[in-house]
Every structure is written in C-alpha cells, then in structure tokens.
Amino acid sequence: MITSREELDAIKKSCRAMVMKSSGLSAGAAVIPVPGVDIGSDVTLLMRLIPKINEKFGLTPEQIEGLDTESKVMVLTAISNVGSKMAGKYITRKLVLSLLQKMGVKVATKGVSKFVPFVGSAVAGGISFTAMRYMGNSHIDDCYRIALETLENREAAMATSTSSSSQTANEGFVPKDAEPPIKDL
C-alpha cells in the first residue's frame, strides 16, 4: 500500500516511462504495411501494460482483495469516483478491444494512411504512438487519482481516530492549578 505522496509521484514517473516504451513499440508495429499487425500488437501491448500499471499503484484485483475491509472500501469508492474502466479489474482482450474501438477514428485513419507510400507509414506510426501514449497516460492519471484519494482518506481516518482517542484519554483530566468548579447553591 502506498504510504506517501512522494512514493505515489515516483510510481507515476516510472509508469510514464513504461508507457513511452510501449508507445514506441506500437509506432514501430504500425509502420509495417501489413493489415492487422498494428491492432494485434496494440492489444498485446495494452494487455501487458495496463496490469503492470495497476500493480505498481496497488490496484490489481488480487492486491485489492488482500486489503482489510476499511481500505478495500476506500479503494473501491475511489475507483468508482474516478470512473476508471481498468483499475482494479482483470484486463481481458475484450476490454482492450472495446477501449480501442472508442478510439476508432484514430485506428481507422491509421489503417487507411498505411497504404499511402512512405508518408502513410510514418503517419500511421505517429497516430499509433499518440493513441498508445494517450491510453496509457490516461490510465496512469486515473490510477494516480485513485491512489491519492485513498491515501488522503486513510490519512483523514487516522487523524480522526488519533484525535478521538486523545480526547478520550484527556477526559476527566484537571490540571493542578485549575480552580475548583463553582457549585450552585
């Protein structure tokens, strides 16, 4: 479980580097003028990338299931608040394909542009790089917001429990130099 904002920022930076690498691989596959190679490689890349990002942020289904009840509720509430489609879920081919279909215009443009000699492959590679980077970074941003909300809620819960327990400990405490209470006659 992430314990500080510094740790969270380091995870985000590490995940951004993974996304850049995957985006480069996606662009490389898109340059190959064979229909379907780019989509197949994008699906494979995303099916590896998204679970790695989830794991780094502590948001795989197994990691969430291993949390205590209170922490699990905090994480699931944060996922719901952010509206993430991939955090805390098993990443399937069907899920990845549906996300790629939502980017359908970019994918279709990439497919058509491939068949324009020389320039078309470069355009397809650029579109593929941009689409992969967008999807990866969007997921990182979602995971970051989920983890940050969970961290802030956990800190607030700890502060509340600490202040209420110190209040309870101080009840009935009267300093030596305090004046005795005035009694009604």
Q: Model segments located where?
A:
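Terminal, membrane-proximal amphipathic helices
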Residues: 1-29, 43-185
